[in-house]
């Protein structure tokens, strides 16, 4: 398996990991860690796809939203000397000497991870960040300076590795400080949404999602899946507007699962949440899928997730089932939908977005 450019840069600096108690946050792939089999390391995963690749035994994880409190949740699995934890956050204090963060796309997400890492390593501990040069590693270095003097350790494969020694002590990470709750209204229905950095449409109602909800079919029945649920915007709206429906929510992100549970609780709702890589590992069938699917992986446009989702959706829908989807107009989804569904209609369109309804 070819390592990601970030992991190739870390492999060049493998001696860095010879000493200390290491933790990794959101490694960019599962395979670099194979080179550290003799070391005891903790790996914090906010993304289920890499977690599942690392542990190689868990295809999906399901949660009752009522079981997820403000304290979060975790799914942990030991693989040799490595402890892998799928979780939205950890509140550890002085648990490690070194934390390696893979640079996320959103600046606010990175700021949150930095704060979490600072409490993990404590005063005089080291935080390391690896990321693509095009992904904002230079601005990341500036953000790191609030914790201490930064040092560029290496640069290769169009990536950089930067280290900061934490100068001051930090209390345990508090997720509540990063939660933002807003009230939205669409078609006469208002509801609250809890979101955090790193979750799609943080602090705002995405215009595409709003269009999808405005044009939502009124002939929904039975079980409905909100794929790539983010903060639970779509599912909570549908449950409030059509309380007879049973909703299921899925996302690859632990932060999304966490925020969705908080959103449901804010609106006195409950549902089953699934952490999964696409629809992999999900076995139950539904009558309808409603989604605003992702088209980015990191900083790059990437249709792979949605292509696979569209082809897999057939197996999750009952006969005559429907999928309602919003997407940027420039994306080639009508043709993809037509390959797998009997009928595909464009039900709404703006200068930026299209809403499609596909029926098996």
Curated annotation (Swiss-Prot):
It holds the Pfam family MTS. GO terms for cellular component: cytoplasm. Its main location: cytoplasm. Gene3D superfamilies: Vaccinia Virus protein VP39 (3.40.50.150). SUPFAM superfamilies: S-adenosyl-L-methionine-dependent methyltransferases. Its EC number is 2.1.1.172. GO terms for molecular function: 16S rRNA (guanine(1207)-N(2))-methyltransferase activity; nucleic acid binding. It catalyses: guanosine(1207) in 16S rRNA + S-adenosyl-L-methionine = N(2)-methylguanosine(1207) in 16S rRNA + S-adenosyl-L-homocysteine + H(+). It is found in: Cytoplasm. It comes from the Bacteria. HAMAP family: 16SrRNA_methyltr_C (MF_01862). Specifically methylates the guanine in position 1207 of 16S rRNA in the 30S particle. Monomer. PANTHER family: RIBOSOMAL RNA SMALL SUBUNIT METHYLTRANSFERASE C. This is Ribosomal RNA small subunit methyltransferase C. It comes from Alteromonas mediterranea (strain DSM 17117 / CIP 110805 / LMG 28347 / Deep ecotype). The gene is rsmC.
């Amino acid at each position: 398996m070819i390592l990601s450019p970030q992991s190739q840069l870390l492999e060049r600096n493998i001696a860095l990991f010879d000493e200390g108690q290491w933790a990794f946050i959101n490694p960019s792939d599962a395979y670099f860690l194979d080179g550290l089999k003799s070391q005891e390391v903790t790996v914090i995963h906010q993304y289920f796809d890499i977690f599942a690749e690392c542990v190689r035994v868990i295809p999906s994880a399901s949660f009752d939203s009522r079981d997820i409190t403000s304290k979060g949740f975790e799914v942990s699995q030991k693989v040799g000397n490595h402890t892998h934890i799928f979780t939205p956050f950890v509140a550890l204090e002085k648990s490690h000497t070194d934390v390696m963060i893979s640079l996320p796309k959103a600046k606010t997400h990175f700021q949150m991870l930095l704060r979490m890492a600072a409490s993990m390593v404590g005063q005089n501990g080291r935080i390391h960040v690896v990321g693509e040069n095009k992904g904002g590693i230079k601005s990341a270095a500036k953000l790191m300076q609030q914790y201490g003097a930064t040092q560029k350790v290496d640069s290769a494969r169009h990536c950089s590795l930067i280290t900061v020694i934490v100068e001051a002590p930090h209390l345990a990470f508090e997720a509540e400080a990063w939660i933002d709750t807003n009230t939205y209204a669409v078609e006469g229905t208002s509801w609250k949404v809890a979101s955090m950095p790193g979750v799609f449409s943080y602090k705002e109602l995405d215009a595409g999602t709003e269009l999808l909800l405005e044009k939502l079919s009124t002939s929904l029945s039975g079980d409905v899946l909100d794929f790539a649920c983010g903060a639970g915007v779509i599912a909570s709206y549908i449950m409030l507007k059509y309380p007879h429906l049973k909703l299921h929510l899925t996302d690859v992100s632990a932060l999304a699962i966490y925020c969705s549970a908080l959103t449901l609780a804010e609106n006195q709702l409950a549902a089953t949440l699934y952490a999964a890589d696409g629809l992999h590992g999900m076995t139950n069938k539904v009558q309808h899928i409603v989604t605003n699917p992702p088209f980015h992986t990191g900083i790059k446009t990437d249709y792979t997730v949605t292509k696979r989702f569209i082809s897999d959706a057939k197996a999750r829908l009952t006969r005559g089932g429907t999928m309602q989807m919003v997407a940027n107009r420039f994306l080639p989804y009508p043709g993809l939908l037509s390959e797998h569904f009997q009928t595909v209609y464009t039900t709404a369109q703006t200068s930026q977005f299209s809403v499609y309804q596909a029926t098996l």
